[in-house]
Amino acid sequence: MSVLFISDLHLEAERPDITRAFLSFLDERARRAEALYILGDFFEAWIGDDGMDAFQRSIAQSLRQVADGGTRIYLMHGNRDFLIGKAFCREAGCTLLPDPSVIDLYGEPVLLMHGDSLCTRDEAYMRLRRWLRNPLTLWVLRHLPLATRHKLARKLRKESRAQTRMKAVDIIDVTPEEVPRVMRGHGVRTLIHGHTHRPAEHPLDIDGQPARRIVLGDWDRQGWALEIDANGHRQAPFPL
Protein backbone atom coordinates (compact mmCIF):
# COMPACT_ATOMS: atom_id res chain seq x y z
CA MET A 1 0.00 0.00 0.00
CA SER A 2 1.03 3.62 -0.45
CA VAL A 3 0.63 7.02 1.18
CA LEU A 4 -0.80 9.95 -0.79
CA PHE A 5 -0.09 13.67 -0.38
CA ILE A 6 -2.08 16.51 -1.92
CA SER A 7 -2.51 20.23 -1.24
CA ASP A 8 -3.90 23.47 -2.60
CA LEU A 9 -7.10 22.15 -4.14
CA HIS A 10 -8.90 25.39 -3.24
CA LEU A 11 -12.23 23.57 -3.42
CA GLU A 12 -15.28 25.75 -4.00
CA ALA A 13 -18.67 25.28 -5.60
CA GLU A 14 -17.64 27.61 -8.43
CA ARG A 15 -15.02 25.08 -9.63
CA PRO A 16 -17.02 21.89 -10.31
CA ASP A 17 -14.18 20.58 -12.49
CA ILE A 18 -11.83 20.45 -9.51
CA THR A 19 -14.53 18.89 -7.34
CA ARG A 20 -15.22 16.15 -9.90
CA ALA A 21 -11.50 15.41 -10.20
CA PHE A 22 -11.14 15.21 -6.42
CA LEU A 23 -14.09 12.85 -6.02
CA SER A 24 -12.65 10.63 -8.75
CA PHE A 25 -9.28 10.76 -6.98
CA LEU A 26 -10.93 9.58 -3.77
CA ASP A 27 -12.69 6.69 -5.50
CA GLU A 28 -9.83 5.58 -7.73
CA ARG A 29 -6.75 6.16 -5.57
CA ALA A 30 -7.44 7.22 -1.99
CA ARG A 31 -9.61 4.18 -1.23
CA ARG A 32 -6.64 1.93 -2.04
CA ALA A 33 -4.12 3.96 -0.01
CA GLU A 34 -2.93 3.43 3.52
CA ALA A 35 -3.24 7.15 4.27
CA LEU A 36 -4.08 10.47 2.63
CA TYR A 37 -2.44 13.70 3.78
CA ILE A 38 -4.03 17.00 2.72
CA LEU A 39 -1.46 19.73 3.40
CA GLY A 40 -3.52 22.89 3.47
CA ASP A 41 -5.71 25.11 1.31
CA PHE A 42 -8.08 22.20 0.83
CA PHE A 43 -10.86 24.77 0.52
CA GLU A 44 -10.67 28.15 -1.18
CA ALA A 45 -12.07 29.70 1.98
CA TRP A 46 -13.37 28.55 5.35
CA ILE A 47 -15.19 30.92 7.67
CA GLY A 48 -15.73 28.42 10.48
CA ASP A 49 -17.30 25.03 11.05
CA ASP A 50 -20.57 26.70 12.01
CA GLY A 51 -20.68 28.22 8.52
CA MET A 52 -20.46 24.96 6.57
CA ASP A 53 -22.66 25.03 3.48
CA ALA A 54 -24.13 22.16 1.49
CA PHE A 55 -21.11 21.95 -0.80
CA GLN A 56 -18.64 21.72 2.07
CA ARG A 57 -20.76 19.13 3.86
CA SER A 58 -20.84 17.01 0.71
CA ILE A 59 -17.03 17.05 0.64
CA ALA A 60 -16.95 16.02 4.30
CA GLN A 61 -19.29 13.13 3.57
CA SER A 62 -17.10 11.97 0.67
CA LEU A 63 -14.05 12.00 2.92
CA ARG A 64 -15.97 10.09 5.59
CA GLN A 65 -16.80 7.32 3.13
CA VAL A 66 -13.12 6.87 2.31
CA ALA A 67 -12.13 6.99 5.99
CA ASP A 68 -14.79 4.41 6.85
CA GLY A 69 -13.23 2.18 4.19
CA GLY A 70 -9.96 2.09 6.13
CA THR A 71 -7.87 4.95 4.70
CA ARG A 72 -6.47 7.23 7.38
CA ILE A 73 -7.00 10.88 6.43
CA TYR A 74 -4.99 13.78 7.83
CA LEU A 75 -5.74 17.44 7.22
CA MET A 76 -3.43 20.41 7.80
CA HIS A 77 -4.49 24.05 7.83
CA GLY A 78 -3.50 26.31 4.94
CA ASN A 79 -3.60 30.07 4.69
CA ARG A 80 -7.12 29.95 3.19
CA ASP A 81 -8.77 27.42 5.52
CA PHE A 82 -7.09 27.85 8.91
CA LEU A 83 -10.50 28.09 10.64
CA ILE A 84 -11.30 24.43 9.93
CA GLY A 85 -11.98 22.87 13.31
CA LYS A 86 -12.91 19.72 15.17
CA ALA A 87 -16.53 19.68 14.00
CA PHE A 88 -15.58 19.38 10.33
CA CYS A 89 -12.94 16.77 11.11
CA ARG A 90 -15.45 14.66 13.06
CA GLU A 91 -17.88 14.84 10.17
CA ALA A 92 -15.18 14.03 7.61
CA GLY A 93 -13.52 11.29 9.65
CA CYS A 94 -10.12 12.96 9.43
CA THR A 95 -7.44 14.01 11.90
CA LEU A 96 -6.35 17.64 12.12
CA LEU A 97 -2.57 17.76 11.82
CA PRO A 98 -0.50 20.59 13.35
CA ASP A 99 1.70 22.66 11.03
CA PRO A 100 4.51 21.63 11.13
CA SER A 101 4.38 17.89 11.86
CA VAL A 102 6.95 15.12 11.64
CA ILE A 103 5.67 11.69 10.62
CA ASP A 104 7.36 8.32 10.27
CA LEU A 105 7.23 7.30 6.63
CA TYR A 106 8.58 3.82 6.02
CA GLY A 107 11.17 4.27 8.74
CA GLU A 108 12.20 7.82 7.79
CA PRO A 109 11.18 10.95 9.73
CA VAL A 110 9.53 13.34 7.25
CA LEU A 111 8.54 16.95 7.93
CA LEU A 112 5.13 18.08 6.66
CA MET A 113 4.15 21.74 6.34
CA HIS A 114 1.68 23.82 4.39
CA GLY A 115 4.62 25.99 3.37
CA ASP A 116 3.50 29.57 3.88
CA SER A 117 5.56 29.95 7.05
CA LEU A 118 8.70 29.35 4.94
CA CYS A 119 8.09 32.50 2.86
CA THR A 120 9.79 34.78 5.37
CA ARG A 121 10.87 37.39 2.80
CA ASP A 122 7.22 38.33 2.32
CA GLU A 123 7.22 40.46 5.44
CA ALA A 124 3.74 41.90 4.92
CA TYR A 125 2.22 38.43 4.63
CA MET A 126 4.14 37.13 7.64
CA ARG A 127 2.79 40.00 9.76
CA LEU A 128 -0.74 39.21 8.59
CA ARG A 129 -0.21 35.51 9.27
CA ARG A 130 0.96 36.15 12.84
CA TRP A 131 -2.07 38.35 13.45
CA LEU A 132 -4.57 35.89 11.97
CA ARG A 133 -3.12 32.92 13.89
CA ASN A 134 -3.05 34.74 17.22
CA PRO A 135 -5.39 32.88 19.63
CA LEU A 136 -7.25 36.09 20.48
CA THR A 137 -7.77 36.91 16.79
CA LEU A 138 -9.00 33.37 16.14
CA TRP A 139 -11.47 33.65 19.02
CA VAL A 140 -12.81 36.96 17.70
CA LEU A 141 -13.09 35.63 14.13
CA ARG A 142 -15.04 32.57 15.25
CA HIS A 143 -17.51 34.74 17.15
CA LEU A 144 -18.21 37.27 14.39
CA PRO A 145 -21.58 36.99 12.60
CA LEU A 146 -21.43 34.67 9.59
CA ALA A 147 -22.23 37.49 7.18
CA THR A 148 -19.30 39.51 8.53
CA ARG A 149 -16.97 36.52 8.18
CA HIS A 150 -18.08 35.98 4.58
CA LYS A 151 -17.40 39.63 3.79
CA LEU A 152 -13.99 39.53 5.49
CA ALA A 153 -13.00 36.33 3.65
CA ARG A 154 -13.90 37.88 0.28
CA LYS A 155 -11.91 41.00 1.13
CA LEU A 156 -8.83 39.01 2.18
CA ARG A 157 -8.93 36.84 -0.96
CA LYS A 158 -9.24 39.89 -3.21
CA GLU A 159 -6.33 41.65 -1.50
CA SER A 160 -4.22 38.48 -1.57
CA ARG A 161 -4.65 38.07 -5.34
CA ALA A 162 -3.83 41.72 -5.98
CA GLN A 163 -0.72 41.66 -3.79
CA THR A 164 0.53 38.39 -5.27
CA ARG A 165 0.43 39.88 -8.77
CA MET A 166 2.50 42.85 -7.59
CA LYS A 167 5.17 40.98 -5.64
CA ALA A 168 8.42 39.65 -7.08
CA VAL A 169 8.56 35.91 -7.65
CA ASP A 170 11.33 35.33 -5.10
CA ILE A 171 9.37 37.19 -2.42
CA ILE A 172 6.37 34.84 -2.55
CA ASP A 173 8.50 31.68 -2.79
CA VAL A 174 10.14 30.01 0.19
CA THR A 175 13.23 31.64 1.64
CA PRO A 176 16.19 29.39 0.72
CA GLU A 177 17.92 29.88 4.08
CA GLU A 178 14.75 29.11 6.03
CA VAL A 179 14.32 25.62 4.58
CA PRO A 180 17.52 24.03 5.98
CA ARG A 181 17.07 25.88 9.26
CA VAL A 182 13.62 24.39 9.77
CA MET A 183 14.64 20.93 8.57
CA ARG A 184 17.69 20.94 10.82
CA GLY A 185 15.55 21.98 13.76
CA HIS A 186 13.25 18.99 13.24
CA GLY A 187 16.05 16.53 12.54
CA VAL A 188 14.80 15.50 9.09
CA ARG A 189 16.23 15.07 5.61
CA THR A 190 12.90 15.20 3.76
CA LEU A 191 10.38 18.06 3.71
CA ILE A 192 7.02 17.92 1.92
CA HIS A 193 4.96 21.09 1.56
CA GLY A 194 2.55 22.96 -0.69
CA HIS A 195 1.45 26.61 -0.85
CA THR A 196 3.78 27.93 -3.57
CA HIS A 197 2.01 26.13 -6.47
CA ARG A 198 5.41 25.16 -7.92
CA PRO A 199 5.56 21.35 -7.95
CA ALA A 200 9.14 20.12 -7.94
CA GLU A 201 11.73 18.17 -6.01
CA HIS A 202 14.71 20.18 -4.81
CA PRO A 203 17.90 18.34 -3.77
CA LEU A 204 19.59 19.88 -0.74
CA ASP A 205 22.74 19.55 1.30
CA ILE A 206 22.26 19.92 5.05
CA ASP A 207 25.39 19.69 7.15
CA GLY A 208 27.06 17.58 4.48
CA GLN A 209 24.14 15.16 4.23
CA PRO A 210 21.85 14.79 1.19
CA ALA A 211 18.31 16.06 1.74
CA ARG A 212 15.29 16.94 -0.35
CA ARG A 213 12.34 19.32 -0.44
CA ILE A 214 9.28 18.07 -2.29
CA VAL A 215 6.78 20.76 -3.32
CA LEU A 216 3.23 19.63 -4.03
CA GLY A 217 1.30 20.94 -7.01
CA ASP A 218 -1.89 22.97 -6.91
CA TRP A 219 -5.17 21.90 -8.51
CA ASP A 220 -6.10 24.50 -11.08
CA ARG A 221 -5.37 23.54 -14.68
CA GLN A 222 -4.61 19.97 -13.59
CA GLY A 223 -4.54 17.87 -10.45
CA TRP A 224 -1.40 16.72 -8.63
CA ALA A 225 -0.64 13.94 -6.17
CA LEU A 226 2.52 12.63 -4.56
CA GLU A 227 2.50 8.88 -3.92
CA ILE A 228 5.06 7.23 -1.66
CA ASP A 229 5.50 3.55 -0.90
CA ALA A 230 8.30 1.33 0.38
CA ASN A 231 9.93 1.35 -3.07
CA GLY A 232 10.08 5.09 -3.69
CA HIS A 233 7.95 8.09 -4.62
CA ARG A 234 6.39 9.75 -7.63
CA GLN A 235 4.53 13.03 -8.12
CA ALA A 236 2.57 13.40 -11.32
CA PRO A 237 -0.20 15.59 -12.75
CA PHE A 238 -3.50 14.35 -14.11
CA PRO A 239 -6.32 16.05 -16.01
CA LEU A 240 -9.25 17.64 -14.23
From Swiss-Prot:
Mutagenesis / variant outcome for changing residue 10 to N: Does not bind to Mn 1
InterPro entries in the cross-refs: Calcineurin-like_PHP_ApaH, LpxH-like, Metallo-depent_PP-like, UDP-diacylglucosamine_Hdrlase
GO molecular function: glycolipid binding; manganese ion binding; UDP-2,3-diacylglucosamine hydrolase activity
Predominant location category: membrane
Keywords: Cell inner membrane, Cell membrane, Hydrolase, Lipid A biosynthesis, Lipid biosynthesis, Lipid metabolism, Manganese, Membrane, Metal-binding
Keyword Hydrolase part of the UniProt annotation: yes
EC identifiers of the protein: 3.6.1.54
GO terms (BP aspect): lipid A biosynthetic process
UniProt GO cellular component terms: cytoplasm; extrinsic component of plasma membrane
CDD domains the UniProt entry points to: MPP_YbbF-LpxH (cd07398)
Pathway this chain belongs to: Glycolipid biosynthesis; lipid IV(A) biosynthesis; lipid IV(A) from (3R)-3-hydroxytetradecanoyl-[acyl-carrier-protein] and UDP-N-acetyl-alpha-D-glucosamine: step 4/6
Binding site for substrate: 79-80, 122, 157-167, 195
Co-factor requirement: Mn(2+)
Family listed: Belongs to the LpxH family.
Protein name as catalogued: UDP-2,3-diacylglucosamine hydrolase
Organism (species): Pseudomonas aeruginosa (strain ATCC 15692 / DSM 22644 / CIP 104116 / JCM 14847 / LMG 12228 / 1C / PRS 101 / PAO1)
